[in-house]
């Protein structure tokens, strides 16, 4: 992949990122808080923040969501201004919203890759082999003889007036029932999984939260370089180590 910016910070400011643990919080309340912080950052006020939290069960639909993607059981959906399609949030899933004024010139793809890198590093530390799938954002486990590729972390962002909003969702020990009524992120040929399911032990949000906080801040500050973690896909040749590639983003 084309890695031209990871030796320096993705952030405009050099002041420390303020990490806040909001616990379990309603989606609308968290969204309003995001917008308030983002407006301050666009004016050069306040500090970059990383909000870490869980939501009560809720579906959110990004700008590319189509009618066919909506829940088959008629569950209500919150329409939001991030990229991507529909997803589910709920207890047992760690959500992170970095509200960050980005360095200029703004590079959205680079920013997303840094968030992916942070989550990949956490999975690796926990003992999971994960990576990226060409043309799809997020963090994935490779396909096996019996299982399709499985997404363990999703990313959906918006950049407005040079400030990033929304962010990451990382499945720790969440129930997967919420995903059954939708096609998560509009991807029909892959699955969804959790850390608990893949590691064969209970992995809680509380265990993972400090790891994610550290990794995200390191990635945004340029202390965690973005590396090539492309997963081999059926019918493709795995990329050579340290190879570079320009990626598309969905």
Curated annotation (Swiss-Prot):
It comes from the Bacteria. The record marks 151 as: Lowers pKa of active site Cys. Disulfide bonds: none annotated. Residues 44-224 form the BPL/LPL catalytic domain. Its main location: cytoplasm. It is found in: Cytoplasm. One of its GO terms (molecular function) is lipoyl(octanoyl) transferase activity. One of its GO terms (cellular component) is cytoplasm. Residues 224-250 are annotated as: Disordered. The active site is at 185 (acyl-thioester intermediate). It catalyses: octanoyl-[ACP] + L-lysyl-[protein] = N(6)-octanoyl-L-lysyl-[protein] + holo-[ACP] + H(+). Its EC number is 2.3.1.181. Substrate binds at residues 82-89, 154-156, 167-169. One of its GO terms (biological process) is protein modification process. Pathway: Protein modification; protein lipoylation via endogenous pathway; protein N(6)-(lipoyl)lysine from octanoyl-[acyl-carrier-protein]: step 1/2. Keywords: Acyltransferase, Cytoplasm, Transferase. Residues 239-250 have a biased composition (Polar residues). Coiled coil: none annotated. NCBIfam families: lipB, PRK14345.1. Catalyzes the transfer of endogenously produced octanoic acid from octanoyl-acyl-carrier-protein onto the lipoyl domains of lipoate-dependent enzymes. Lipoyl-ACP can also act as a substrate although octanoyl-ACP is likely to be the physiological substrate. In the reaction, the free carboxyl group of octanoic acid is attached via an amide linkage to the epsilon-amino group of a specific lysine residue of lipoyl domains of lipoate-dependent enzymes. Belongs to the LipB family. This is Octanoyltransferase. The gene is lipB.
